[in-house]
Amino acid sequence: MSHPQPLTPEQALAGAKKRLELPRIVVICGSTRFMAEMAEADLRETAAGRIVVKPGCDMKSPHALWSDPAGAEALKARLDELHRAKIRLADEALVVGDYIGDSTRAEIAYARELGKPVRFTHPVVDPGVAGDRRHGDGPVTTRAGR
């Protein structure tokens, strides 16, 4: 007699989202230099009927929460883990901007490792495209870009 396999946490979450009839959840990824573009992407995704989660802190802008270097380092680690949780929660990722740095590249790899679809506002910077060496070395200018 065979026993049913227990659900993985991912399967349980997917089932719960379906039973709750939740809209698709999109996580916005990208360099915090693109916070304004992330806000625009949030607006567009929300208007399209999707739930949006995105970075909530721009540590490149001065703020009392990260003015102490030691505290800032610990906060950055917590925020990175929080963003990975947002990626796990989401149904898909949207990468904003025409530049992919190390952190964003790691987020893309993590989302793909989890089997999440990944969209780009600037597909030319997709690190999954064979032979594309333009990411991570600076901004990429595209006709569809800024």
Predicted feature descriptions by range:
Residues 1-146:
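Conserved catalytic or regulatory cores that recognize and/or transform ribose-phosphate-containing ligands
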